[in-house]
From Swiss-Prot:
This is Dihydroxy-acid dehydratase 3. Functions in the biosynthesis of branched-chain amino acids. Catalyzes the dehydration of (2R,3R)-2,3-dihydroxy-3-methylpentanoate (2,3-dihydroxy-3-methylvalerate) into 2-oxo-3-methylpentanoate (2-oxo-3-methylvalerate) and of (2R)-2,3-dihydroxy-3-methylbutanoate (2,3-dihydroxyisovalerate) into 2-oxo-3-methylbutanoate (2-oxoisovalerate), the penultimate precursor to L-isoleucine and L-valine, respectively. It comes from Bradyrhizobium diazoefficiens (strain JCM 10833 / BCRC 13528 / IAM 13628 / NBRC 14792 / USDA 110). InterPro entries: DHAD_IlvD/Edd (IPR050165), Dihydro-acid_dehy_C (IPR042096), DihydroxyA_deHydtase (IPR004404), DiOHA_6PGluconate_deHydtase_CS (IPR020558), ILV_EDD_C (IPR056740), ILV_EDD_N (IPR000581), IlvD/EDD_N (IPR037237). [2Fe-2S] cluster binds at C67, C140, C212. Pathway: Amino-acid biosynthesis; L-isoleucine biosynthesis; L-isoleucine from 2-oxobutanoate: step 3/4; Amino-acid biosynthesis; L-valine biosynthesis; L-valine from pyruvate: step 3/4. Its EC number is 4.2.1.9.
């Protein structure tokens, strides 16, 4: 059967096979699609453009954050590549909440929530407009997993592109990232630096647009996209302001058309248990963001794979730390790029059996084929796995009576992985920040911030503001901090987050009282409150749930839907199916 479109100049003929292959034909072909084509013509598309495959390009370009401001020229280059290869690019945008600007106030409740909004909005546009394929850009922290989740949910030929990091700053010969500005506030409070120095750091630490320069959440998830095979090989560490990024995007535009022609590989072909383990391995190997322990299960959920914080923790425990990267180490993303890129890490982990090189990538080739020619570790930025910085990874998942379903700590850079102290309980982040600003806390205390989990926050706020103050005051390893909220990828010190179950739903964190003794033993992956079980049982009987903080609006809807941290704090379970497009 052939369909004639008399409304189109030149008449379009599409047989059943192509109708099945190109989803967009449901919007472009046939007599009754004349109104649809009219809308397309109003956007400047001619007959030839309407007849070609429609490729969506999603980004967050805008003025919310410098992290996404590299997207503009990269998207333009991707459009060129698509057009050169015979496709019609269709650009659209989605939300982004700057983790930096929303930090340490109520706005941070929207950060993790925005990850779900991004995935949802990609699903809405790609399926709502029946695009044939997708190129998705990420920049600020939650945009990367949000886009990857959206890609896997839609399951059309897709390429993820990380927009790249900023260049590091310099003051007095010292390399800076934005973390230095957070910690400098604490240093100023103690008198270690003066206001002039604080201002110089503020003005110098982010000299260009692009995401934060250390191995914080954005760069971590950029590397994860490589280790999982969802992006063009060895591009994640190219700084966002480099002209090379235009070449990368133009290549992506051509490659997406090749993927569309051959029918894949599709995101759910790429996202497997093995590729998820590869993603977890590169997090551990580089001392990456603890947020990855939340994002990997969320990506897995979109593919229908049960991959929880326990699975992430197993990979963390068997993977050596070989990346000497900030915040636990010395170097930045640019330094990794200068020695050969993420390929150096990936190939070293493939060589030593910590990454499965047989996993497929978007190119149709395996990781081993794509990364086999990578440079060897330089021994300074990236160590050999046979002589690692640490033998068992820079991030750890803890269990114990305080976190029966798990908690996460970044151990990279810690002088000691053991801490025992007495609890000082705060019912929200603001109360703890006030105590730290007043310096009304002391060495040996375990600062407990609760009711900041996915439901209780709601939104599971990041605590970089308070952890950086503590570190800047020289107390980073003299106290511990525990929370059912999250940490920034830039957090360092004895900080344990993602405690689950969260306090708001009756998790053990809700039972902690001032003066309770708490033991943290990261070496043995344990965290416990040293309180007798009869006393804990009595506290459980007395515990009463708190009223929700939001009864209407977006956060109220989020709180009703969101799950706990071990499963990724997702708002639905399992893969979305669209049989209409199958």
């Amino acid at each position: 059967m052939k369909l004639r479109c008399p409304a189109a100049y030149g008449t379009s003929h599409v047989d059943d096979a192509n109708m099945k292959k190109l989803r967009s034909r449901i919007t472009t072909d046939g007599l009754d699609r004349a109104p649809h084509r009219a809308f397309m013509r109003a956007m400047g598309l001619d007959d030839a453009a309407i007849a070609k495959p429609m490729v969506g390009i999603v980004s967050m370009k805008g003025e919310q954050t410098p992290c996404n401001m590299t997207h503009d020229f990269q998207v333009a280059a991707a459009k060129t590549g698509i057009e050169e290869a015979g496709g019609t690019p269709r650009e659209f945008s989605t939300v982004s909440v700057s983790d930096g600007i929303s930090m340490n106030h109520e706005g941070m409740k929207f950060s993790l929530f925005s990850r779900e909004l991004i995935a949802d909005s990609i699903e809405a546009v790609v399926h709502g407009l029946a695009y044939d394929a997708l190129i998705g850009y990420g920049g600020c922290d939650k945009t990367l997993p949000g886009v990857m989740m959206g890609m896997v949910r839609c399951n059309v030929p897709s390429i993820f592109i990380y927009g790249g990091s900023s260049l590091p700053g310099r003051v007095d010969g010292r390399t800076l990232t934005v973390l230095d500005s957070y910690e400098a506030v604490g240093s100023f409070m103690t008198g270690e630096i003066d206001s002039a120095t604080l201002e110089r750091i503020e003005r110098a630490c982010l000299p260009t647009i692009g995401a934060c320069a250390g191995q914080f959440t954005a760069n971590t998830m950029g590397m994860v996209s490589e280790a999982m095979g969802l992006t063009i090989p060895n591009v994640s560490m190219v700084p966002g302001v480099y002209a090379e990024r235009a070449q990368i995007s133009r290549r992506a535009g051509r490659l997406i058309m090749e993927m569309l022609e051959r029918g894949g590989p599709l995101p759910r072909d790429i996202v497997t248990r093995k590729s998820l383990e590869n993603g977890a391995a590169i997090v551990a190997a580089t001392g990456g963001s603890t947020n990855a322990a939340l994002h990997l299960p969320a990506i897995a959920n979109e593919a229908g794979i049960a991959f929880t914080i326990d699975d992430v923790g197993e990979v963390f425990a068997r993977t050596p730390l070989i990346g000497n990267l900030r915040p636990g180490g010395k170097y930045t993303a640019k330094d990794v790029h200068d020695i050969g890129g993420a390929a150096v890490v990936i190939q070293e982990l493939i060589r030593t059996g910590h990454i499965d090189g047989n996993c497929i990538t978007i190119t149709g080739r395996t990781l081993a084929e794509e990364y086999g020619a990578a440079n060897a570790p330089d021994g300074e930025v990236v160590y050999a796995a046979s002589a690692p910085i640490m033998p068992d990874g820079g991030v750890a998942v803890l269990k114990g009576n305080l976190c029966p379903d798990g908690a996460v700590i970044k151990v990279a850079g810690l002088k000691s992985q053991f801490f025992e102290g007495v609890a000082r309980v705060f019912e929200d982040e603001e109360a703890c920040v006030a105590a730290v600003r007043d310096r009304s806390y002391k060495a040996g205390e375990v600062l407990v911030i609760r009711n900041e989990g996915p439901v209780g926050g709601p939104g599971m706020r990041e605590m970089l503001g308070v952890t950086a103050l503590i570190y800047g005051q020289g107390m980073g390893e003299k106290v511990a901090l525990i929370t059912d909220g999250r940490f920034s990828g830039a957090t360092r010190g004895m900080c344990i987050g993602y405690v689950s179950p969260e306090a708001f739903v009756g998790g053990p964190l809700a039972l902690v009282r001032d003066g309770d003794k708490i033991r943290i033993d990261a070496t043995n992956r344990r965290m416990d409150m040293l309180v007798d079980e009869p006393e804990l049982a009595a506290r459980r009987r007395d515990w009463k749930p708190r009223p929700p903080r939001h009864r209407a609006g977006a956060l109220a809807k989020y709180a009703r839907l969101v799950g706990q941290a071990p499963g990724g704090a997702v708002t639905h379970e399992g893969p979305a199916e669209w049989p209409w497009f199958e």
